[in-house]
């Protein structure tokens, strides 16, 4: 992984991990289309660390509030307020994806990484699902109204994000909209519930990398990838949360349809060969 590739793919990760357009699809399809070599474990660590840093910095006040609320809930042995419930709802929503990811992430990645046609189709299919949820969802509920059942349902949907082309933020926002939450509530809970998942993935891959050792010459690309994905990730979170306050998610749906259609067309017409 050279420095330029690390910067470009780091920025691509930061943007596409946050926006509902699938980071895994872009990180597979872009190198495939450009003929770049596959990124290894070192760069996977950079991407996850960068994304985690972006989320932690942006949601730092929420994280502190949840920590205080957790202590308060334990102290009073009560979950009688939305603030006291939120940390436990975030944890509950992360459980399904954590279990499925631990058991099947490697198999799913190997199954779809070499099948760009399926990735293109999933971009289209789940883009349509996002569009329908945004169009027909009632949007009457706020994030403070999330219940345990809501958190578990959204968490189950998050399991699908292991499939390239689905999008973690996209599928969880879709689930939130289907459950009647407004766009801001669905998006904000989507990001908060991603914190333990992204943290766990970053820690797991980092431990694996430390066990293997950082390959010679990859220290600088590793740092560049972390910074690039962190900066663009932070900007993308801020942008999306402002965007959904006043606008629909339709532009992201159209992007998914066009990008997925382009990938499918390239493959079926043999242009990539």
UniProtKB/Swiss-Prot annotation:
Principal location: membrane
Residues spanning the membrane: 39-59, 86-106, 117-137, 146-166, 189-209, 220-240, 249-269
Top enzyme category: hydrolase
NCBIfam families: undec_PP_bacA (TIGR00753)
Keyword Cell inner membrane: yes
Domain of life of the organism encoding this protein: Bacteria
One Gene Ontology cellular component: plasma membrane
Name of the protein in its database record: Undecaprenyl-diphosphatase
Pfam families the record matches: BacA
Miscellaneous information on this protein: Bacitracin is thought to be involved in the inhibition of peptidoglycan synthesis by sequestering undecaprenyl diphosphate, thereby reducing the pool of lipid carrier available.
Keywords: Antibiotic resistance, Cell inner membrane, Cell membrane, Cell shape, Cell wall biogenesis/degradation, Hydrolase, Membrane, Peptidoglycan synthesis, Transmembrane, Transmembrane helix
Biological source species: Pelobacter propionicus (strain DSM 2379 / NBRC 103807 / OttBd1)
Recorded family membership: Belongs to the UppP family.
Catalytic activities: di-trans,octa-cis-undecaprenyl diphosphate + H2O = di-trans,octa-cis-undecaprenyl phosphate + phosphate + H(+)
Membrane topology: Multi-pass membrane protein
InterPro entries in the cross-refs: UppP (IPR003824)
Enzyme Commission numbers on file: 3.6.1.27
